[in-house]
């Protein structure tokens, strides 16, 4: 790691949130892990924002990044394309260590397969709800015989005893989900808030799906955002919520429940030549 998120220092006992990077977890076959450079790109973009810490932020009507001294950056989890099982184990261990200390992990992926071991980090703790922001459902049992790839993390999360339920948000268009996958998620007690509903009713109404004080984590696949705002993704789907609306949603969720962690996935720096998607993501994380 050559840069830290927002210039944050190394983790200390007093750190309230710790940023980690994970380039990949479980890659499908011989596909190129195009999101592997995302942690470095997001960190680099965040440094453009760090110089404004303390300045007025029009989106929150308050000074920007007053929390900066409370966060740390723990670098990247070691991952290797040929060691999917080891990748998942190391990511879960790193997240669990942060949760054990009472801090909040913020994981910068990486493709969406890192979401499964991220959620697994709460296995020794009180149950959490997963708020899954994504254009796709990610509820396939397996694709090509692989049950831990990026089409399956929410299916695997739903099988974890410490996951209370999943609130899917932002789904639209057509992807890998089949009718049976949608029904399976509903039958498991999960909720689907389609993109059109979020845009129609707004952030506060969707955040109201949480019980006040409910412990939750956010799994944010970047293609959940409309590609007009953040185009640098593998599977863009038009018609989604804009970055501003998602920022409002994240803030509303945090105000209503107890945010325990955040993972950001599926951003592909190779598709972001001007760095605007990375900057938008760094900004969303700061919300």
Roles of regions detected by a PLM:
Residues 1-287:
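Conserved alpha-helical scaffold segments that buttress catalytic/binding sites
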């Amino acid at each position: 790691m050559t840069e830290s998120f927002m210039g944050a220092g190394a983790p200390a006992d007093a750190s309230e949130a710790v940023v980690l990077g994970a380039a990949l977890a479980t890659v499908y076959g011989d596909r190129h892990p195009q999101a592997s450079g995302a942690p470095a790109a997001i960190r680099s973009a965040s440094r453009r924002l760090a110089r404004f810490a303390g300045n007025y932020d029009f989106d929150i009507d308050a000074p920007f990044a007053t929390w900066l001294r409370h966060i740390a950056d723990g670098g990247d989890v070691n991952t290797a394309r040929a060691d999917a099982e080891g990748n998942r184990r190391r990511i879960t261990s790193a997240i669990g260590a942060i949760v054990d200390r009472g801090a909040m992990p913020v994981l910068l992926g990486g493709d969406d397969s890192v979401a499964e071991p991220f959620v697994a980090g709460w296995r020794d703790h009180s149950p959490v709800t997963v708020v899954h922001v994504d254009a796709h459902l990610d509820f396939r049992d397996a694709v090509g015989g692989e049950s831990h790839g990026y089409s399956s993390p929410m299916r695997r999360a739903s099988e974890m005893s410490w996951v209370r339920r999943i609130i899917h948000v932002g789904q639209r268009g057509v992807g890998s989900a089949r009718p049976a996958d949608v029904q399976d998620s509903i039958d498991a007690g999960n909720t689907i808030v389609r993109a059109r509903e979020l845009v129609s009713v707004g952030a506060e109404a969707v955040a109201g799906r949480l019980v006040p004080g409910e412990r939750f984590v956010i799994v944010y696949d970047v293609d959940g955002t409309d590609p007009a705002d953040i185009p640098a993704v593998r599977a863009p789907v038009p018609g989604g919520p804009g970055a501003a609306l998602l920022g409002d949603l994240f803030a509303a969720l945090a105000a209503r429940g107890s945010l325990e962690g955040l993972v950001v996935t599926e951003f592909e720096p190779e598709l972001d030549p001007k760095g605007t998607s990375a900057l938008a993501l760094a900004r969303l994380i700061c919300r």
